[in-house]
Amino acid sequence: AFYRAQYPDWSKEKIQNKIENMTDEDMDDMVEPSIYDENIDHVRLVVEDIFKNWRNRSNEGKYNALFTTHVGGNKASTPMAVMYFNEFQRVNKERAEQGLFTLKTAVTFSQSTNNGDYQKVTNDGLWSAMQVYNEQFGTAFGLDDTSAYTQDVASRLNRTAIDGNFLDIVIVVDQLLTGFDAPQMNTLYVDRTLKNALLIQAY
């Protein structure tokens, strides 16, 4: 039914062949957007829970965490990642005013160059997050050097940054989930579906 609706010109044979050879990305595209996707109430509850349990889960800050989010229905996931980042910043500001601990947070994902519907919101969100990061860590990254930015974020997550100024939590869509070694990272927060090899490699 999904492929008939999406591709009315496709033959039954072509649809059947597509179904029999579906990739993980195809399955993700078929998932209807969840009521949790880009739902600010959900985001606030998740962030609230992370702060509430942070001292215990991080062993009083000895360890840090990775947070991955992804939305279904063939929609861009980057706005959701930015929504989480903005909520962490909002809560950090409130907590700082109350004299409570805050969490050094960053978000990283690939810059969009596909001229798609979500390109502007993706790149604006990334640029905004980079400005917060630059202010926090004394860096000067922009959209012209996102690769260097991601490398710097990774060094602060795996605690190899030369200045010793490290991150508590990094929000990603797909980056850093595989092939990334961070001995002091003990928690993976997951607000998405993870399947097959990605599930195994992420954990």
Q: Model segments located where?
A:
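Conserved helicase motor "Helicase C" RecA-like lobe of SF1/SF2 P-loop NTPases
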Residues: 73-129, 173
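Conserved RecA-like ASCE P-loop NTPase motor core of nucleic-acid helicases/translocases
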Residues: 63-72
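Conserved RecA-like P-loop NTPase helicase motor core
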Residues: 110-203
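Helical mechanochemical/support elements of P-loop NTPase systems and associated helical scaffolds
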Residues: 42-46, 80, 149, 195-198
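Short helix-terminating capping/connector loops at secondary-structure junctions
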Residues: 59-62, 96-103, 164-166
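Generic amphipathic alpha-helical segments used as scaffolds and interaction surfaces in large
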Residues: 30-41, 72-75, 140, 144
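Short glycine-/polar-rich loops that comprise or flank the Walker A/P-loop
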Residues: 62-63, 100-104, 183-187, 197
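Interdomain helical connector at the RecA1-RecA2 junction of SF1/SF2 helicase-like NTPases
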Residues: 1-64, 82-85, 90-96
